[in-house]
Amino acid sequence: MAPAPLGVPEEQLLGCRSRVLSRLLFIAQTALLLLPAAGAGLCPAPCSCRIPLLDCSRRKLPAPSWRALSGLLPPDTAILDFSHNRLSNWNISLESQTLQEVKMNYNELTEIPYFGEPTSNITLLSLVHNIIPEINAQALQFYPALESLDLSSNIISEIKTSSFPRMQLKYLNLSNNRITTLEAGCFDNLSSSLLVVKLNRNRMSMIPPKIFKLPHLQFLELKRNRIKIVEGLTFQGLDSLRSLKMQRNGISKLKDGAFFGLNNMEELELEHNNLTRVNKGWLYGLRMLQQLYVSQNAIERISPDAWEFCQRLSELDLSYNQLTRLDESAFVGLSLLERLNLGDNRVTHIADGVFRFLSNLQTLDLRNNEISWAIEDASEAFAGLTSLTKLILQGNQIKSITKKAFIGLESLEHLDLNNNAIMSIQENAFSQTHLKELILNTSSLLCDCHLKWLLQWLVDNNFQHSVNVSCAHPEWLAGQSILNVDLKDFVCDDFLKPQIRTHPETIIALRGMNVTLTCTAVSSSDSPMSTVWRKDSEILYDVDTENFVRYWQQAGEALEYTSILHLFNVNFTDEGKYQCIVTNHFGSNYSQKAKLTVNEMPSFLKTPMDLTIRTGAMARLECAAEGHPAPQISWQKDGGTDFPAARERRMHVMPEDDVFFIANVKIEDMGIYSCMAQNTAGGLSANASLTVLETPSFIRPLEDKTVTRGETAVLQCIAGGSPAPRLNWTKDDGPLLVTERHFFAAANQLLIIVDAGLEDAGKYTCIMSNTLGTERGHIYLNVISSPNCDSSQSSIGHEDDGWTTVGIVIIVVVCCVVGTSLIWVIVIYHMRRKNEDYSITNTEELNLPADIPSYLSSQGTLSEPQEGYSNSEAGSHQQLMPPANGYIHKGTDGGTGTRVICSDCYDNANIYSRTREYCPYTYIAEEDVLDQTLSSLMVQMPKETYLVHPPQDTTALESLIPSANREPSAFPTNHERISEKKLPSTQMSGETLQRPVWNINRELGLPHPPFSQQPVHESPQLHQNEGLAGREPDCSASSMSCHRLQDHAFDFSRTRNIQDGSEGT
């Protein structure tokens, strides 16, 4: 060794030599590594080449050290990695035609680098963990082919509208920056190509609505920001988005339509936020959603219709929330759900049938809840899960398993019952399943005769290696594995677990009553028992209970425990299913469920009001009632269900609006309408009268009349309308002068002129009026002289014939008044009885239309028929008199003869004379039925046969029929007896018409209302002139002296002048 130079320590010299040698060794090794690449081109130092990768990472060299690379890149280099160096800037131009990817992660770059000509070919640029403060669009415009840009873990604070030039970028990662603001339109230049955006771990507190106008974006991540509220339409514009991740933001509220517009999204991750409720408002529009993860939130409730817009869910994670109950509608609509995680909540209530909609569910996780009762109570909580293969129930404080606990789980293969202190398992509890794996560990089993089956079942199904079960009772078997217990040791010497002896009973009560429910249980153990009452599977805390214990010695000593639940002043909120749970140290037992139903009698909120309305209008009746259960509303008309409006499809019932409509009201709709409210507690009704008003009209057209002098003229004015119109008559546009020859019938609808003379001819006007208007009609009466009468013959018996005709009319009136009055008394009596049976008519006044005078309100309701009209026959018009039927007068010889009537040509005769002359007259029937009847009645009947009685005021239309045309009665009246004695047998012709009194109106087509006749006071005398009727008088032109009949004095007087009524009109 050479001596050390003077002044230089030997140790220092040796150190320098070692460093030089190590560097030379490094250079030699590098050269050896680069030799393989030398054949294809030299690999620049200090990089490593693995074509197409040029790896220059982790060299910790500054930028000036890399200038030598500018022209030394291998020709096939496509990937360049400068990560983990100390690059603070880069302005080195590279020469490569194949470079596509550049990674410069974990450096100290402050801006986006430029690589010269190869920059335009780069498709991937990763600048992770640098100190770039902003995105410069000018720097990015040199990257026209760039598809992936990773700027995560920099110090970028905002994304501006000008941050990105128009480019075909597909992947953008801006996570772990300091971004607080996203300017509107900041991603617009990337909208045609961007597929993935990551903005995790930034400082954004809100997302402006419609900020993402990226129709092709498929994946968006916003995890670990500071977003608290998501507004509606925030993500509108992301039509192709498939996955959205927003974990750990502290989101407390998702407003309605928050995710609207995400029509193709399949995955939504919202874990570790502060959501409190799942509802359809913020799920609106997610029709393609398949995975929803909302674990680690504060969700307390699932709305009944929460899943209406996302019924394609296949996986739902609701674990680690604060759910306490699962209502019946919690999972409605999720028929495609395959995996459901409800673990680590506080569920204590599962409604019956809550899982019945999940027919496709395969995995259900309910670990670490409080649903022991679902297994212990045999409530069939899992009914409907026909496809379930895996059920996790660990950590639910389950103490016993009933034989019905797993009914419906035909496909179950994996059952996890770990961490439950199970004491008893009923035989055949797992018979409904096809278990391949059973996880069970318990040391609390009550090893009595009821558990003997379990040992053999575990062996037969090869589960003895996957379970860890041991006995706790009886004491001499405590701690022993059930697999080691002999079968003869499973005995039942007592019943330590409580047994229910008295179950609460189902009760139906009225609101306000007090209700008592009783539950009794017995146990052979001295272990104290306690009782808990549940309503609809939820524990009742603040209730009034009475508990007592006594010893029961019917089959050995036992402890009997009784609990009485008192419910005072029950209301509708008390309705439900009640159940008692008796518990001691050895387990719990559940009573049957008793249903409490609280009813309330219906009461009306709206009652129908009496209504008066015109024909053709719309009738509207309101009726609403409340009660519990809600009463059913129905309608009746006049105590029945026959609605003319319903048959004609004019009736409309609006149950939601409590309104009953009748369109285009008609007269037949008039009546009493009853609103019936009925529920299980009872029923009641309210009535309203519908009065239909109709303007006056002519039921039958008015017809002109032509009569022969001396005949009786009947002028018909058959009126219709509601209320019944009042009729007045005028003659020749002036007052009608009423004499003893003028009579009115059927409420002035018939004007009868007896012994018509030439002075009676003229224009007669019928004026009908009611509150709705007035109608007029004209009838022209023509009186012609008889061509066959001479003066001598007309003087014979003229006076007697006229007065006999008057007598006939009076007799008819009297007889019909009596018969009709009796009929109306009976009809009115039965109508009132019927109304009292089914109706309670409102007493309020009628509500009249504005155009109807108020005096109509005093006319009463339809339960009392109005004068002149009957409600029950409002649309029926009966005939006044039977037709003549072509009656032909017979002479004394049995052949056709002539009838003598009063004529004397009426030119110079005194029509009020007591003596009248007779002339022969051949009867010719007229076309009008009513005139035929009256004419034949007045002319054909012998005047000798009548017994005249004083007439009475009548209100019946039938009064125009003579008693001779009435059917004989079983009990003849005095009048009929006298008539039978006085009438000659020769006058009782077999052809005389026999018609009942009550058929008159029907045959004439007139309504029931009676006619009003002016009262006539007579002094009746009986006139008999036998043989006169069969004899034809000798009425020659020269003979003026004719036989005269015996004179009779008749005094006619009237209580009311019809002329007064006419003038008043």
Curated annotation (Swiss-Prot):
Residues 1013-1024 have a biased composition (Polar residues). Detected in all tissues analyzed. Residues 963-990, 1003-1040 are annotated as: Disordered. Keywords: Cell membrane, Cytoplasm, Disulfide bond, Glycoprotein, Immunoglobulin domain, Leucine-rich repeat, Membrane, Phosphoprotein, Repeat, Signal, Transmembrane, Transmembrane helix. One of its GO terms (cellular component) is extracellular matrix. Disulfide bonds join C519-C580, C623-C675, C717-C766. GO terms for biological process: innervation; membrane protein ectodomain proteolysis; negative regulation of axon regeneration; negative regulation of membrane protein ectodomain proteolysis; positive regulation of protein localization to cell surface; protein localization to cell surface; regulation of neuron migration; regulation of platelet-derived growth factor receptor signaling pathway. It is linked to Urofacial syndrome 2: A rare autosomal recessive disorder characterized by facial grimacing when attempting to smile and failure of the urinary bladder to void completely despite a lack of anatomical bladder outflow obstruction or overt neurological damage. Affected individuals often have reflux of infected urine from the bladder to the upper renal tract, with a risk of kidney damage and renal failure. This is Leucine-rich repeats and immunoglobulin-like domains protein 2. It comes from Homo sapiens.
